[in-house]
Amino acid sequence: MTKVLEVIYGFGYGGIRAFIMNYLNFLDKDKFKVDIYVFGYESSPFTDKVKELGANIFFEPENNAAKKPWLFVKQLEKFMKGHGPYDVVHANTNLISAWVLLAAKRANVPVRLAHSHSASHFGESWKQNLYSYLRRFMIDRLATKKLACGQLAGETMYGKNAKFEIIANGISLDRFMYRNEKRIEELKHKFNIPNGAKIYANVTRMDPQKNHLFAIEVFREIHKIDPKAIFLYGGVTPKISPTVEVVKAKIAEYGLTDYCRYTGPVMDVEQLYHMTDLWIYCSAYEGLPFGPIELQAASIPVIASDVITDEIDLGLGLVHFLSLNDNPKKWAELAVCIQKKQIPSDIIIKAFQKYNFDIRQGVKKLEAIYEGN
């Protein structure tokens, strides 16, 4: 049996956690035993689910990767030697992967995988750029294989001429295509949604990256056109994040409190998708986000910022791109014109298979990589 260690910062409601859980659901349990090492947090709402899927999850509350990388490497190496031996270490930690892979090398792990999940730029000052270069150099030397969620994410982390393999953010279509009318009505009641109101949403991690303030500017313009419209926002909040209070203050400043709903984390986000009419996905940067992919499986339209890779568009006519340089009024005018429509399930399935976003396709590729192929 191949023993795999997944390394990740936090295990909340974000996309990297979703990636691990999605693949964990479909990995061959007779061939692979998975442990998950979570640093920077001491718990997760998904602990029980991880255990149900036959995996173990371990927490290191300290996050020494940024300021004390030598201590981080020492702690992780000790863990690997104490809980291994591991055949595979899969670093889902962007540039922090340099330190994860160093620990894996010192622990004699034969298959060492770096995985880019983001297309963010990793530094602005010359010191930050130099530090990023050092970690990229280490990853290049220490990784036995480099992975990425998409072309843009791979080029951003490894370089345009680097060799890497794409592991798509595959999803289970059955989960997102299924519409549960009873649960949708429960959610409408929970969030006090008036009958007939058109629902717009940006329920993503409360982080500046997700650009909630711009989404509020867009909804402000939508409200001028459609005074009955409702806006949902929220999602998981990092330990230290002023974003929630800043967004709530802006909503109050614009007099929109009665028309905006803070959801907090939502476990069955697929039914929240089905409840809504359109999503405003105005991130400042992304790798290849799960949200727009999942929304297309649910047949929900999306307006996305053009900094997001066009790899998210599966050709179903549901994704519309606008620039963050366009004024919010332009976003709002497009939003109110887009009508929700149900795409036939067979067409959705074909599109997901064509672009390799069906989890059953991706898991075969990942299993081969875990086996050293």
Q: Over which residues does each language-model region extend?
A:
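A conserved mid-protein helix/loop that constitutes part of the nucleotide-sugar donor-binding site
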Residues: 14-22, 198, 202-221, 245
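Glycosyltransferase donor-sugar binding loop
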Residues: 36-44, 171, 203, 230-245
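Short hydrophobic beta-strand element within catalytic cores of glycosyltransferases
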Residues: 38, 301-306, 311
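Acidic anion/phosphate-binding donor-loop and adjacent secondary structure
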Residues: 64-71, 155-158, 170-190, 195-196, ...
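Aromatic "clamp/platform" in nucleotide-sugar-dependent glycosyltransferases that forms part
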Residues: 265, 284
